[in-house]
């Protein structure tokens, strides 16, 4: 929706916002650092609404817990949106200046009445009404979610439904307001930033953009296909069709993490060639033709990690990896070398500097600055740039870029 896969706010903003919706997230247990900031916000007067089928330890801190039925997130979100519109609380200024499709959205959610939503979600109509009015009228408000929203067959629709609420009320592009996916594992954000996506190059640059692609072609000495690749679900479909016959799996265990484990095991086991690179022999590794033992990135490798507020921080090697294990970067570079490609990296910093030369949002993040400042948030366009705490302030500019 916004063009880059990252939370729009910083952790500090949760300390100074007026309302926080924690949806499908038990952050007290899964994101304790973030939750520490959230509790400061609560103590400073922010209202906290927890949306979760379970009354989690995070929900215990909430002013209101909305215990919805499993899988009814879209019905609840659309009912909140409808109530905001019915009460005349939508932010018409923001809608008119920065959005498309309001009338279509309004028509779509019209059937999601409070009574309908109560039947579908199990959440009392009064609680839905309270959240809708509180969210729309709060001077600053944010929605934060985790895997309770994204680990569903309709995960994309879940996320879009939540983003619609933020766009409807204008709670984005300003300090203290935004949408914030709390990443499910360490450095998931960093993986996306580096271009581990089917339609993006590093720095969330579109692979279908000829000018951007040409920049990477020149730097890497290759011709990048001018079309998006497969996402994970599409890869398994391609295996089933016979269009994908070889897989290099790094730090991923789909035999156990896929919803349909039986299908995943069958398809991965039937590949012509499967390589697994991981810190121990996983269930997926047991099916592999080649297993490459990797170092643990959190203790045995140099590099960076990026957290859920887009903050890039240095990781320093503390231990030598055991046995024949090597760090991921070294393994990948050696595989490339044996295939006739020379990346020219001598260190993790070399690879990082290559990224900085190609990704404008990382350009100002030298290792020196990361060390001195304890981390920086992207975008950070040059070595004088402080990094941006929140994203999309452009949506409030005249005219909107």
Predicted regions and their residues:
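Cofactor-pocket helix-loop regions in the catalytic cores of large enzyme subunits
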Residues: 1-187, 193, 206-397
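Surface-exposed loop and adjacent secondary-structure segments within mature catalytic domains
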Residues: 195-199
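Glycine-rich active-site loops that engage anionic ligands at enzyme catalytic sites
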Residues: 203
């Amino acid at each position: 929706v916004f063009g880059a896969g990252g939370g729009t706010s910083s952790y500090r903003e949760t300390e100074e916002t007026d309302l926080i919706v924690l949806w499908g997230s038990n952050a007290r247990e899964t994101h304790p650092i973030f939750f520490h900031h959230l509790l400061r916000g609560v103590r400073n007067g922010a209202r906290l609404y927890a949306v979760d089928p379970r009354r989690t330890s995070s929900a215990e801190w909430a002013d209101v817990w909305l215990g919805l039925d499993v899988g009814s997130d879209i019905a609840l979100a659309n009912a909140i949106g409808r109530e905001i519109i019915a009460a005349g609380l939508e932010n018409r200024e923001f809608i008119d200046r920065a959005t498309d499709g309001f009338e279509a959205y309004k028509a779509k959610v019209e059937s999601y009445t409070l009574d309908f939503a109560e039947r579908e979600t199990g959440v009392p109509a009064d609680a839905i009404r309270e959240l809708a009015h509180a969210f729309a009228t709060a001077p600053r408000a944010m929605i934060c979610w985790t895997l309770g929203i994204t680990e569903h067959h309709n995960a994309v629709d879940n996320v879009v439904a939540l983003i619609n609420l933020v766009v409807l009320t204008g709670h984005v592009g300003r300090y203290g307001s935004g949408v914030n996916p709390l990443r499910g594992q360490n450095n998931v954000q960093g993986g996306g930033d580096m271009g581990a996506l089917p339609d993006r190059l590093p720095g969330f640059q579109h692979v279908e953009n000829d000018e951007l692609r040409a920049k990477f072609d020149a730097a890497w000495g290759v011709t990048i296909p001018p079309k998006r690749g497969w996402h994970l679900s599409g890869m398994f479909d391609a295996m089933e069709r016979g269009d994908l016959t070889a897989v290099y799996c790094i730090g991923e265990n789909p035999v156990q993490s896929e919803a349909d484990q039986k299908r995943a095991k069958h398809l991965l086991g039937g590949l012509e060639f499967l390589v697994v690179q991981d810190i121990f022999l996983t269930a997926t590794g047991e099916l592999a033709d080649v297993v490459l033992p990797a170092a643990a990135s959190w203790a045995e490798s140099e590099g960076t990690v990026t957290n859920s507020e887009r903050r890039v921080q240095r990781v320093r090697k503390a231990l030598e990896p055991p046995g024949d294990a090597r760090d991921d970067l070294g393994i990948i570079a050696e595989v490339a070398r044996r295939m006739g490609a020379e990346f020219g990296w001598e260190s993790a910093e070399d690879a990082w500097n290559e990224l900085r030369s190609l990704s404008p949002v990382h350009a100002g993040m030298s290792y020196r600055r990361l060390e001195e400042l304890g981390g920086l948030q992207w975008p950070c366009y040059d070595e004088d740039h402080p990094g941006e705490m929140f994203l999309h302030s452009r949506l409030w500019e005249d005219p909107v870029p």
